[in-house]
Amino acid sequence: MAKTDLARRVYNHTWKLDPIIRSLLDTDFYKLLMLQMIWGLYPRVDATFSLINRTSSVRLADEIDEGELRAQLDHARTLRFSKKEMIWLAGNTFYGRKQIFQPEFLAWLHDFHLPEYELRRKDGQYELHFHGPWTHTTMWEIPALAIINELRSRAAMKNLGPFSLDVLYARAKAKMWSKVERLRQLPDLKISDFGTRRRHSFLWQRWCVEALKEGIGSAFTGTSNVLLAMDTDLEALGTNAHELPMVLAALAKTDDELRSAPYRVLQDWNRYYGGNLLIVLPDAFGTAAFLRNAPDWVADWTGFRPDSAPPIEGGERIIEWWKSKGKDPREKLLIFSDALDVDTIEETYRHFEGRVRMGFGWGTNLTNDFAGCAPQSIDGLKAISLVCKVTDANGHPAVKLSDNPQKATGDPKEVARYLRFFGNEERVEQLVRV
C-alpha cells in the first residue's frame, strides 16, 4: 500500500468535499455479522440509533460546521457495496470459515444503502438520530461516529501550517512507535485494532494498523475495520455488540422474556456462527445479573468480552464463574477492549498470564492519541467519549445498564426499572474518558 504524507494531505484541503467514508466496508466487522442475523431473524423490527456525547463539556455543534457534517452524512448515503467488495465478502475466509455470509444475504446487501438521518442543533450539541428498519439503521453507527470524530480533528487542525502539521504527525508517530516497542516485550500477546469509531482519521488508522503489522508481527492478529482488513490482507475481527440484547429486551412483553433476552441473543448467534465467534458480551444489564441467571450451556462458549468493568476485576469475576461451572479457565478466552492503553494492557497481561487465554482489542488510544503532540495546545485533538446507541425498538425505549453506571443509556425511568429488575450489585462508577 502506498504511503501517504499525512501532514501534506491534511494541509492540502482545496477540494470541495473530502469524503471521510468512501466505502460501506469502512465499518466494524461485527456490524456485518450482526446485520446478517438481524436480516435473517428480525427483518420487521424498527430501531432508532442516536448520537450520545458522554463528554458533555465538549460542545460539538460549536466545533463542527453543520453544513460540513450534513455533506459527509449525505455522501455516505450515496455509497453502495462495490463488485470487488461483494466478491471479497463472498469468497474470503473469516474465522477459519468459508462462506460465513449466506448467498441470499449478500444478494440483499448488494443494493444496501444507508437510510435518512435527522439532525439538529441544541445547546451546543448535535442531536443526530437514525430511524427505520433495524436492518438499515444499525449500519449508521460506525460511519456516523467516524465522520464526527474526523470532522472534529479537521476543525482542530485547520489553522496549522505545513510545518506545524509535520511536527504534529511526527510526534504522534513517535508516540505510537514507543507503544509498539513496549508491546514487543509481551511474548504471547494477541492484540487487534478496534479503533474505527473514534479514530483521528481513516488515514491515521491505516498508518497505525500498518505500524502494528510491521512492529509486532504475529502478535497483531487483525483489525475490526473491514475495509482495512481487505486492503492490508489482515484478519477481519469482531463478535457482537450490546445492541442485540438491548433490542430484544426492549421488545420483551413479560418479565421472563426480559430476563431471558441476553441468552436468547446467544442462542440466535449460535444458529449463525460458532467456534471463536462464540464470545459472550455479558454487561448490557450488568455482568453480575448475567452470570447469576446464565444457563449452564453459556459456560461451554469459547470466551467472554468483559467490556465495562475494570479489566482485572472483570476478568477475575468471569474466571471464578467458569470454575464454579467446572471449566478450566486456561482453555477459555478473555477479550479485553474497554479504554485500553499500553499501561493497562501490560498490567492485565501480566496479571492473567498463564491463567487464561487473552486477546486485546485496542481502540481509541491506538487510533486517536494525539495528547501532547501539537506544537501548541489544541483541545480539539483530545479524544472524547462519543457513542451511537440504539434508543428505541418498535416504539419501546432501549436501555443499557453496563457495569459502569457512567455508561448507562436510555430513558431514566426505564433505566430505573431495569435496575430494579436486574439489580445493581457489583456496578462500579468510573470516569469515562473514551
Swiss-Prot record:
Catalytic activity: nicotinate + 5-phospho-alpha-D-ribose 1-diphosphate + ATP + H2O = nicotinate beta-D-ribonucleotide + ADP + phosphate + diphosphate
Alphabetical list of InterPro entries matching this protein: N/Namide_PRibTrfase (IPR041525), NAPRTase_N (IPR040727), Nic_PRibTrfase (IPR006406), Nic_PRibTrfase-Fam (IPR007229), Nicotinate_pribotase-like_C (IPR036068)
Annotated protein name in UniProt: Nicotinate phosphoribosyltransferase
Gene3D superfamilies associated with the record: nicotinate phosphoribosyltransferase
PANTHER family tied to this protein: NICOTINATE PHOSPHORIBOSYLTRANSFERASE
Alphabetized SUPFAM superfamilies for the sequence: Nicotinate/Quinolinate PRTase C-terminal domain-like (SSF51690), Nicotinate/Quinolinate PRTase N-terminal domain-like (SSF54675)
GO biological process, one term: NAD biosynthetic process via the salvage pathway
Protein's job: Catalyzes the synthesis of beta-nicotinate D-ribonucleotide from nicotinate and 5-phospho-D-ribose 1-phosphate at the expense of ATP.
Post-translational modification: Transiently phosphorylated on a His residue during the reaction cycle. Phosphorylation strongly increases the affinity for substrates and increases the rate of nicotinate D-ribonucleotide production. Dephosphorylation regenerates the low-affinity form of the enzyme, leading to product release.
The family this protein is said to belong to: Belongs to the NAPRTase family.
Pathway in which the depicted protein is active: Cofactor biosynthesis; NAD(+) biosynthesis; nicotinate D-ribonucleotide from nicotinate: step 1/1
Keywords assigned by UniProt, alphabetized: Ligase, Phosphoprotein, Pyridine nucleotide biosynthesis
Any one GO MF annotation of this record: nicotinate phosphoribosyltransferase activity
